[in-house]
């Protein structure tokens, strides 16, 4: 059964890929990798070769020639680190949301919501810019005093 209800038999010609059907294909292949490696993952060093192998198995020539990542941070984390890494990523988001709501910090909540939603359609931590951006702003909002007027325009 397909997790994303996308059949790899329905692969369009290379000229007919769009952001939606491309991501559905990438997510379907990612779910296959997760099914085969759910406990411990495959490790960061095997990510590219494993994706290429599964693209080849599924006759996904467009993915094979373009070396796409999963375009979903949660799936990518699950592939690389297994269930423990996925659980840790979800834990980071949940505890951060809980903190933002307890502080009644609207800007932190908006930041986390935006980053969370963006992570569904992009591998945000695949490059160091995403890691630095998330780490910096999460730390900034976390350690900002609750009564801070830094957001206020006078």
Residue ranges and their predicted role:
Residues 1-14:
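Short extracytoplasmic/periplasmic juxtamembrane "stem" segments immediately C-terminal to an N-terminal membrane anchor
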């Amino acid at each position: 059964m397909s997790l994303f209800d996308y059949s790899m038999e329905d692969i369009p010609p290379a000229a007919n890929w769009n952001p939606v059907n491309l991501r559905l294909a990438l997510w379907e292949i990612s779910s296959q990798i997760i099914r085969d490696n759910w406990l411990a993952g495959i490790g960061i060093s095997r990510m590219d070769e494993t994706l290429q192998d599964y693209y080849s198995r599924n006759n996904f020539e467009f993915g094979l020639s373009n070396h796409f990542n999963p375009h979903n941070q949660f799936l990518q984390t699950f592939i690389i680190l297994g269930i423990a890494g996925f659980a840790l990523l979800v834990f980071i988001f949940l505890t951060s949301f809980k903190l933002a709501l307890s502080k009644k910090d609207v800007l932190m909540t908006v930041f986390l919501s935006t980053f969370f939603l963006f992570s569904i359609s992009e591998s945000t931590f695949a490059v160091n810019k995403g890691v630095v951006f998330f780490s910096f702003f999460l730390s900034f909002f976390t350690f900002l005093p609750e009564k801070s007027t830094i957001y206020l325009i006078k």
